[in-house]
């Protein structure tokens, strides 16, 4: 398990975006080998998405051979509703990059048979070869996706009734009116995310400091579902200073002492543009023994 501590939200977002960029470039995806990426919604990943869009526009990264699977979606909201997660992803990320629409997978909260939709989503993940990197965020109560306190730590994609704390937290997106907030959602399970070959969890802000403490310094507990990722062989927690306020000083000092090593994970790699330039130049070289 790695804990990456950056001073500010913007730095944490950039580190996370660089990590995703490097993983995609290292994977070297193509028509016969797609990179599969799990993605969250919410305010936390917005900075990361903006940096990824920047890398694409600069010619440093392509999403042409990337398949995405989103964590969750509300039940009952039309796809084009401004607060649906489908709208969120397209407005904040997908429409700004070169990903093919058929390669984006978001649960349908208006499906006739909701559990069948969840089962089909699991099958699509399997058919894609599993998730290479699942990126997630958490709530102040440590929930990941809509796996709220008390959720099974081996759960799969399913229909979930939302806790009142979540409904209250989400009311700000629905004009502050609780009656407008969906009370159910479709969500990947903790087990679904745990199956990914790698997991990166973004945690920023003082209001999530206690959740980070539960995830890092205490044991695995289904009342804090994020704690399950202590047991994943390749988990990276990325946070800002504010999120570390509940951690012990020696814990923060220990992980900060590893940053010289961890920062090598986001060292610049060849961009798409640089690869094409190198290939073009090598093709012009005269033949020699």
UniProtKB/Swiss-Prot annotation:
Annotated catalytic residues: 72, 141, 143, 148
Pathway it works in: Nucleotide-sugar biosynthesis; UDP-N-acetyl-alpha-D-glucosamine biosynthesis; alpha-D-glucosamine 6-phosphate from D-fructose 6-phosphate: step 1/1
Cellular compartments annotated: Cytoplasm
Alphabetized SUPFAM superfamilies for the sequence: NagB/RpiA/CoA transferase-like
EC numbers on record: 3.5.99.6
Signal peptide: none
Modification sites for N6-acetyllysine: 64
Cellular component GO terms held in the UniProt record: cytoplasm; cytosol; extracellular exosome
Catalytically driven reaction(s): alpha-D-glucosamine 6-phosphate + H2O = beta-D-fructose 6-phosphate + NH4(+)
Protein's GO biological process: carbohydrate metabolic process; generation of precursor metabolites and energy; glucosamine catabolic process; N-acetylglucosamine catabolic process; N-acetylneuraminate catabolic process; single fertilization; UDP-N-acetylglucosamine biosynthetic process
Main location: cytoplasm
Phosphothreonine modified-residue sites: 161
GO MF: glucosamine-6-phosphate deaminase activity; identical protein binding; isomerase activity
Top enzyme class: hydrolase
Domain of life: Eukaryota
Gene3D superfamilies: 3.40.50.1360
Quaternary structure and partners: Homohexamer.
Job of this protein: Catalyzes the reversible conversion of alpha-D-glucosamine 6-phosphate (GlcN-6P) into beta-D-fructose 6-phosphate (Fru-6P) and ammonium ion, a regulatory reaction step in de novo uridine diphosphate-N-acetyl-alpha-D-glucosamine (UDP-GlcNAc) biosynthesis via hexosamine pathway. Deamination is coupled to aldo-keto isomerization mediating the metabolic flux from UDP-GlcNAc toward Fru-6P. At high ammonium level can drive amination and isomerization of Fru-6P toward hexosamines and UDP-GlcNAc synthesis.
Family per record: Belongs to the glucosamine/galactosamine-6-phosphate isomerase family.
Name this protein carries in UniProt: Glucosamine-6-phosphate deaminase 1
Encoding gene, per UniProt annotation: GNPDA1
């Amino acid at each position: 398990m790695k804990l990456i501590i950056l001073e500010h939200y913007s730095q944490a977002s950039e580190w996370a975006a660089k990590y995703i960029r490097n993983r995609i470039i290292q994977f070297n995806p193509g028509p016969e080998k797609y990179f599969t990426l799990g993605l969250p919604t919410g305010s936390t990943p917005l900075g990361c998405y903006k940096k990824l869009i920047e890398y694409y526009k600069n010619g440093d990264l392509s999403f042409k051979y990337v398949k995405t699977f989103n964590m969750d979606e509300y039940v009952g909201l039309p796809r084009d509703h401004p607060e649906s997660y489908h709208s969120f992803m397209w407005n904040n990320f997908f429409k700004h990059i070169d990903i093919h629409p058929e390669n984006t997978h978001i649960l349908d909260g208006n499906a006739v048979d909701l559990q069948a939709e969840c089962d089909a989503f699991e099958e699509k993940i399997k058919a894609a070869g599993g998730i290479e990197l699942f990126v997630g965020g958490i709530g102040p109560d440590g929930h990941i996706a809509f796996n709220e306190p008390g959720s099974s730590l081996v759960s799969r994609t399913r229909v979930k009734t939302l806790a009142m704390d979540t409904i209250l937290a989400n009311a700000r997106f629905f004009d502050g009116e609780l009656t407008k907030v969906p009370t159910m959602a479709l969500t990947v399970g903790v087990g679904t995310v745990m199956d990914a070959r790698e997991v990166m969890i973004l945690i920023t802000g003082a209001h999530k400091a206690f959740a980070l403490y539960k995830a890092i310094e205490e044991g695995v507990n289904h009342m804090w579902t994020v704690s399950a990722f202590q047991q994943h062989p390749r988990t990276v927690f990325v946070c800002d200073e504010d999120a570390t306020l509940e951690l012990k000083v020696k814990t923060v000092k220990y992980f900060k002492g590893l940053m010289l090593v961890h920062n090598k994970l986001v060292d610049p790699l060849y961009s798409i543009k640089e690869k094409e330039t190198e290939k073009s130049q090598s093709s012009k070289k005269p033949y020699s023994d």
